[in-house]
Amino acid sequence: MEDYKLLQLETATVDAQAPPLPTKTVPVFAPPLSTPPQPNELVYTKRRRTKRKAKCRCLFFTMGMFALGVLMTTAILVSTFILTVPIGALRTAPCPAETFGLGDECVRPVLLNASSNTRNISGVGAVCEEYSEMAASNGTAGLIMSLLDCLNVGDSESVMNKLNLDDTQLAYCNVPSFAECYTKGFGVCYAARPLSPLGELIYKARQALRLDHIIPFPR
């Protein structure tokens, strides 16, 4: 019994002399406390926002002025083109059938009955009205018919084919073998060459702007 008590005392003495074991501490991270901004920081933030807004407004203003300038320049160019384009440049459409182009006009040679009163200019005008065209003077008609006769010398069909007159009575009457053509006269009708699609657009634009009385545009 005494030996057991001595053993307990020795064990307690050793335990008292042993160094304490290290303990592990776990750090606890706490969220930082929000500190109120200083007065200098508030002023700097407000100035930075003001500068951003000013830059955005300046950019929008510059882009708007650029777009406005482009639109105004386009409008000026289009208006100048509509007002100053020559009429001859817009009459580029081909002439109708049984006519041929002569400058800005489409010429239509027509045959007339010699016994009727269609040899004078008023009679030719009545024939031309059927085609919504005007009658050329006798001198002009004679020059045009003489020109056709000169072109047809040696080959009676090639010129008529080129002038889009191959299926007309005038083409047959240029051949001397048709005796019935001797009893007929001739006349010349003419009209302005048709407008091209661009010419039609410009003509309608001038009508919409009511500029016909300032800048004549014969239809």
UniProtKB/Swiss-Prot annotation:
Q: Name one GO cellular component term.
A: virion membrane
Q: Which locations, inside or outside the cell, does it occupy?
A: Virion membrane
Q: List residues in topological domain: Intravirion.
A: 1-57
Give the keywords, sorted. Answer: Glycoprotein, Membrane, Signal-anchor, Transmembrane, Transmembrane helix, Viral envelope protein, Virion
**Glycosylation positions?**
N113, N120, N138
Question: PTM per UniProt?
Answer: N-glycosylated.
Tell me which parts of the chain lie in the Virion surface compartment: 79-219
What membrane topology is given? Single-pass type II membrane protein
- Please state which protein family the record places this protein in: Belongs to the herpesviridae HHV-1 UL45 family.
Protein name, per record:
Envelope protein UL45 homolog
What is the species of this protein? Equine herpesvirus 1 (strain Ab4p)
